[in-house]
């Protein structure tokens, strides 16, 4: 009787487990179907429900982890994606599934790349590559090479972009990362070509072209993007075709072939309109506006910048609006329409204040100052020292010859404030005023050079600006407060400069977390309590207790980071039918870690230290209507280079230096002799 009862109980338990297994698998399959249909959020709900039900099948659970990680990655919840891909990796290693371990390592590497943990991502992707080669899995090897190339590309781009350098002018470590990406993409390309995978070839060509572009290899970038364009047309992939046209336009800009670049940007604009992507349409208009600025066709530049402005306003992209107003102000200035230029400069200033763009605010103020000088208006924040009796001589109208197109990016002459379309100034007045009418980009360069320096007083700032000025003023200064040699050195400018510097200092400060006691009595009372315990062990000659304490603390921290089978959600173990699974899990926990584990541990510890460092101020946010590859900075840099080329380098004469050094020595000796004789 008892035997029959035990048998009935076992049968009932089996049926319950069977229903649970079926329920878990059904939920997982429904989640997979929803994710494939594009509804990842609903799919995640079914996968989470499957995990709640649980399963004894480790391979099924591993597949659920992988799908959950991918779904969370698609939803941009990278912390959750990292968690489930880590569970998948742990489980795959536990059951000895090398193929599953390779895939989990690749997924983990992609997630770490997005989070900016590039060194850890490289370790994971390299593990994916090593296992694929061990298994002779060519498809997996190609995918691992592509992922590893993406990590190096992202690492180089991330470390190289914040600086003011030109494309291709990067530090050695950045160039090494980008070159490693090129090598990996080329290896991937040869492998997928042998496999006959045209879609993978297209992706490889696109990324290869982008990396060559960053390295400054613009001809190689053009070749790669042309191949990408060809494959995109084969598949009818309009989005990829549009990206290829845009990338080709960017490359031709830096080759100085502006006409060719404009043709590719027009094709980009056409496809963006076909795809009904308003943000990309605005980006194309913005790029075309800048291209025609480089071609000095300011009428067309204004037309495209106005289109960009309209779409930015439609999409409520204030950053894009500000950039459009800046560009329009420069173009109208070049045409001599200073009233319109003033309008857009004021709008640029207003938007820069609204979005907290201090650099844009400073640039807008300088542009307004320039335009007010041209129009003979008084400066809004201070009394201008420029007279309003400007004489205009009509006989000089049209005397200036229009500059031809320049192909060299080093010698561009753009955004003139006094083009030939404006009635020219009297030659004498023009000679006096022309040095004062500085280009916005030149002034911006000058202020950027001052950014990192400390100024002890306002007078010191004034002296630096006066020495650097090229302005001419024949009036003698009546007081120290009058600064007639440089109209930009006024109080409003210095107020802005001081605020700009203070904000930069605030961005570099560390913010203390938690409640801190600030009173001296509280600090005095708290200090002995805090220092009492460590003072005994540290000061004592016998530091064994301290080292034991440190070792135990470190071991607890390491234990917290270990993966245990009890922490795997959805894993159900029973005494009856899974002793082998439990034994494998326990055996896996007791294994001695290999050298690869310690390499990963060192990198992880290094990244944890990096996470505790003070991050630099974040880069300015870009709006959706401003393209990532914004070459408007090229216009500013070309202006800055022209200013640098006009500087005079003083050559030191060693004979003269020694002569002056001898004179100074003799004078000092004579002074000492005079003092001694007086005594």
Curated annotation (Swiss-Prot):
One of its GO terms (biological process) is establishment of mitotic spindle orientation. One of its GO terms (molecular function) is G-protein alpha-subunit binding. The keyword Membrane applies. One of its GO terms (cellular component) is lateral cell cortex. The keyword Thylakoid does not apply. Pfam families: GoLoco, TPR_10, TPR_12, TPR_7, TPR_8. It comes from the Eukaryota. GDP binds at residues 608, 613, 642, 647. It is found in: Cytoplasm; Cytoplasm, Cell cortex; Cytoplasm, Cytoskeleton, Spindle pole; Lateral cell membrane. The modification Phosphothreonine is found at residue 487. Each GoLoco domain can bind one GNAI3. In the auto-inhibited conformation, the GoLoco domains interact with the TPR repeat region. Plays an important role in mitotic spindle pole organization via its interaction with NUMA1. Required for cortical dynein-dynactin complex recruitment during metaphase. Plays a role in metaphase spindle orientation. Plays an important role in asymmetric cell divisions. Has guanine nucleotide dissociation inhibitor (GDI) activity towards G(i) alpha proteins, such as GNAI1 and GNAI3, and thereby regulates their activity. Belongs to the GPSM family. PANTHER family: G-PROTEIN-SIGNALING MODULATOR 2, LD33695P. This is G-protein-signaling modulator 2. It comes from Mus musculus. The gene is Gpsm2.
